[in-house]
Amino acid sequence: MELADKASFRDAMAHVGAAVNIITTDGPAGRAGFTASAVCSVTDTPPTLLVCLNRSASVWPVFSEHHTLCVNTLAAGQEALSTLFGGKTAMDERFAAADWQTGATGCPRLEAALVSFDCRIDQRVSVGTHDILFCHVVAITRHPEPRGLMWFGRGYHTLMRPAC
């Protein structure tokens, strides 16, 4: 059976909503960050996320040298920061655009993130053009912002937390 073509797959994936995240790291190879929507929960025992990173991305060499990262899930209103980390902007300029703390792993944690998952990279698997990073969560920081930022239909959208 033949595989679907690349264009059809990308068009179909535009119908799947995803949280917008900035993935950060810091260590001997330097500080780096990129925007990602290909992030999801794997299991809660142990708490594990997966992060997909294109091996042709400018940040790949840095992430390939490090064993920790922080998944910073963006809140509504942080579209410009997402765009900045998704482009060709220099790392110093990316990080200068927001306030950061040092997380439990030493990685940059976005102060105004909806939630931040400080992680240790446990396993790497290469599939096609990407590396899949399996990350054990060692610390979680939540922000009271009630609105999340989603990527759907090739654009940003706000998702409201329901009132309890």
Curated annotation (Swiss-Prot):
A GO molecular function held by the record: riboflavin reductase (NADPH) activity
Catalytic activity: FMNH2 + NAD(+) = FMN + NADH + 2 H(+)
Name the UniProt record assigns to this protein: FMN reductase (NADH) RutF
EC number annotated for this UniProt entry: 1.5.1.42
InterPro entries assigned: Flavin_Rdtase-like_dom (IPR002563), NADH-dep_flavin_reductase (IPR050268), RutF (IPR019917), Split_barrel_FMN-bd (IPR012349)
Lineage, opening ranks: Bacteria, Pseudomonadati, Pseudomonadota, Gammaproteobacteria, Enterobacterales
Alphabetic keyword roster: Flavoprotein, FMN, NAD, Oxidoreductase
GO BP annotation list: nitrogen utilization; uracil catabolic process
HAMAP family: RutF (MF_00833)
Membrane-spanning intervals of the chain: none
Family: Belongs to the non-flavoprotein flavin reductase family. RutF subfamily.
Top-rank EC class of the record's enzyme: oxidoreductase
Annotated function: Catalyzes the reduction of FMN to FMNH2 which is used to reduce pyrimidine by RutA via the Rut pathway.
NCBIfam families membership: RutF
Organism from which the protein derives: Klebsiella pneumoniae (strain 342)
